[in-house]
């Protein structure tokens, strides 16, 4: 009986050991599957220069959230507030595949592609709906072809309107910038302002606050959104905003992606990105329309004087632009006249 009990105990022990090994093997297999699944998930890095309250961050977040909800093993990590690249240095790494996505004022890349300077041409865009039509026109297709040469594609189209600020006085017409140290966002605006005898200091909109504070700048123009995001109302005496009637300053600020990176994704991942981008683009247009009026309230609440551009002021700026920015663009860009004509043809 003792021998039998010993054998029974030995069998039970062996069975217990076998079960332990099976359980451990199962746990290891599940863990390995989890690691494999995580390894299959693709992470994309998206860079921009604004805070997480800015409309352009919100556009990026809509795309990131939409892709996450699609559950296609694709994650978009957003690096805002110029934490990954300096604002004017994002297009080149994007084109080289060192950066996956960015929300960028395209005229910042005018050094790489001079045609991009047309995306901030004074008086070219009439209003937000006109901007949306430009984004769907042969003119934009021509610009997208140039982006494709750099291995870049557009995911989300978007234009923002903007205005002027003066540190010590209001700016409505060309005579008001005579002798002022002024910031403009792109080459075409710089050329126009130089034609009005302003001195030009080039910088990203994220640098306007410090430049105003230290006396480097007397005046600046940028988008209504950036004026608020960067708290420029703390440094100026007067704000001339864009209105429904007169918006001299309209800037194309799309969400871009490296083309090869997009093409390397699965069909499900590509479709998820495009669906999220479509939703973000609709949001961008509707919110962009609200930014101008919202910025006026912020500046008013801060005690800043609000000035208005008259029809005569607008016409004077546009006449100056045609003699400076427009002529120089056509002279500097080989197909500049064709691109300008395509843009002007959009009703």
Residues of each region from the PLM?
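Short, Lys/Arg-enriched N-terminal segments with co-localized hydrophobic residues
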Residues: 1-18
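N-terminal secretory/targeting leader peptides
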Residues: 15, 42-130, 139-347
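A periodicity- and composition-biased signal for non-globular, repetitive helical segments
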Residues: 8-11, 26-27, 51
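Residue-level recognition of conserved structural "scaffold" positions that shape functional pockets
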Residues: 9, 32-39, 222, 226
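Gram-negative bacterial Sec-dependent N-terminal signal peptides
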Residues: 19-40
